[in-house]
A protein has these predicted regions:
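Short glycine/serine/threonine-enriched helix-capping/active-site loop
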Residues: 1-4, 107, 175, 218-219
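Canonical Radical SAM [4Fe-4S] cluster-binding loop centered on the CxxxCxxC motif
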Residues: 2-35
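Cysteine-centered iron-sulfur cluster-binding motifs in ferredoxin-type domains/subunits
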Residues: 8-15, 57, 264-268, 274
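Residues that line or immediately flank small-molecule/substrate-binding pockets and catalytic motifs
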Residues: 23, 55, 83, 109, ...
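A short acidic, helix-capping loop that chelates divalent metal ions and anchors anionic groups
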Residues: 25-27, 114-120, 182-188
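Radical SAM/AdoMet-radical enzyme domain recognition
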Residues: 33-52, 61-177
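Radical SAM enzyme [4Fe-4S]-AdoMet core and its adjacent flexible, acidic
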Residues: 123-128, 132-135, 139-256
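Flexible mid-to-C-terminal extensions adjoining Fe-S/redox cofactors in radical SAM and related proteins
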Residues: 230-297
Length: 297
């Protein structure tokens, strides 16, 4: 599958302390429905088969239903809504999205503990809305793949969060290490944990999902931390993605990660995973350096 990721606007009803988009909401207006349709049409002409509506928070864009409907009319097979999940708490809104053509939903839940999730999203009540949203979508028989951003404040809770995902019957969950850009960069002194410290909790969380028969993934955690869990590295199966952003179009997000976003050192050439490992985000190395990373023979 090849897909297009369209950031339809940067307005948001949360203000996450790890947000990679930072203050873009203050500088960029929503894309108009015509701009969204143009991006969808071009993507379809280029034979892309999937679309992810994201942002910002796509569910508060005034034309989200029309945009989804147009994607369906064009014949996109996979129409995903990547969201903080709060609007999914409204059952009728979920119904409208599904009727328009959405068939994958990716809400974000960052802790099994209400106070931690609400703290990280800067929004009291957000946890309850996301949980209700997942319940609504399951009642409507939708495919749910959640995303959790790993930070210093929630990594110890990952096993309990995995248990909650099982209880909520999500289809897939992913643990993604924080990308230190935007608001995350502003908070990096207290927000960013060492990868070596999080791994026991990440692996316990993965085990819980694996044992329950769920699809589980990690993102932005290199192979040298994932011994025995190499099959659960998201980058190895990520579809080729075009990103339509405020500043322009990234034709290949994979190329961006490999050539600009992430980094490997000379010693990595001796690792068995050198040709398939992307390495860590560059910003992580500026904080902690290479000491934790090792060569896998």
């Amino acid at each position: 599958m090849k897909r297009v990721d369209i950031k339809i606007g940067f307005n948001c009803n949360n203000k996450c302390k790890f947000c990679v988009q930072g203050n873009k909401r203050e500088h960029y207006q929503n894309k108009s429905i015509n701009e969204i349709k143009e991006a969808l049409y071009k993507a379809k002409q280029n034979e892309l088969t999937g679309v992810v509506f994201t942002g910002g928070e796509p569910c508060i864009h005034p034309n989200i239903i029309e945009a989804v409907r147009y994607a369906k009319e064009l014949g996109f097979e996979y129409i995903q809504i990547q969201s903080n999940g709060r609007m999914f708490a409204y059952y009728d809104f979920c119904q409208k999205l599904i009727l328009a053509g959405a068939n994958e939903f990716s809400p974000a839940l960052h802790s099994s503990q209400e106070q931690i999730h609400d703290f990280l999203t800067s929004n009291k009540g957000a946890f309850q809305q996301v949980v209700q949203g997942i319940k609504n979508l399951k009642k409507l028989n939708q495919y749910i793949l959640t995303n959790t951003v790993i930070t210093s404040r929630n990594y110890q809770d990952l096993p309990a969060l995995a248990e909650l995902f099982i209880d909520l019957s999500v289809d897939q969950f992913q643990f993604a290490f924080v990308h230190i850009l935007g608001t995350a960069a502003e908070n990096q002194d207290w927000l960013v944990p060492k990868k070596s410290e999080i791994m026991p909790f990440v692996k316990r969380g993965l085990d819980i999902g694996i044992n329950a028969g769920k699809r589980v993934m990690t993102e932005a955690i290199p192979y040298c931390f994932m011994e025995g869990y190499e099959d659960y590295i998201a980058e190895k199966i990520m579809p080729e993605t075009q990103v339509v952003d405020a500043e322009g179009v990234i034709e290949s997000y994979s190329d961006y990660r490999w050539k600009l976003g992430k980094e490997k050192r000379k010693e990595c050439e001796n690792c068995r995973y050198f040709n398939i490992c992307e390495g860590p985000w560059k910003e992580y190395l500026e904080i902690y350096g290479w000491e934790e990373f090792k060569i896998i023979k």
